[in-house]
């Protein structure tokens, strides 16, 4: 099993240097980045004490990725594949839907996300994700995830 995180390809250089960091850590360490989230999402994250968590998807598809491109927060996106070992980290949290949703159930039980039928269920990893758990696309092309020799193409024209 893999988990996924979308990002603007322009962020890949800093991710390769520092790992995948929460937006709060990026700001605290003054690391330039192109966020996929908007100000409202970050405000809700902060209110729910989730600003220091990296949000991961259960599948390489998420309406927020498409919306971020449509709203021009990012130019395009690539999917990073994250080893599921992060699930067992003591501080990892799980949400049955997008963690910023009012009705979201967020706790430390992996089944909260893994058993959820909601395609926006999330795994929330505190702080940052070490490089050893991140698989990068073999070629940096917008909207492409290379996994197990198969290519999943997200057509940016549809955004």
Please annotate each region the language model reported:
Residues 1-159:
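Active-site-proximal loop/hinge segments that shape catalytic or ion-binding/gating pockets
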């Amino acid at each position: 099993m893999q988990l996924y995180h979308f990002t603007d390809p322009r962020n890949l250089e800093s991710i390769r240097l520092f790992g995948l960091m929460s937006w709060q850590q990026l700001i605290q360490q003054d690391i330039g980045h192109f966020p996929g989230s908007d100000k409202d999402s970050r405000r809700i994250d902060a209110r729910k004490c989730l600003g220091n968590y990296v949000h991961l998807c259960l599948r390489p598809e998420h309406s927020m990725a498409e919306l971020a491109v449509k709203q021009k927060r990012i130019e395009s996106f690539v999917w990073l594949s994250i080893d599921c070992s992060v699930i067992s980290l003591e501080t990892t949290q799980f949400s049955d839907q997008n963690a910023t949703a009012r009705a979201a159930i967020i706790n430390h039980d992996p089944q909260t996300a893994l058993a959820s039928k909601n395609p926006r269920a999330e795994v929330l990893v505190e702080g940052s994700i070490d490089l050893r758990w991140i698989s990068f696309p073999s070629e940096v092309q917008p909207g492409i995830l290379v996994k197990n020799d198969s290519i999943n193409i997200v057509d940016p024209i549809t955004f």
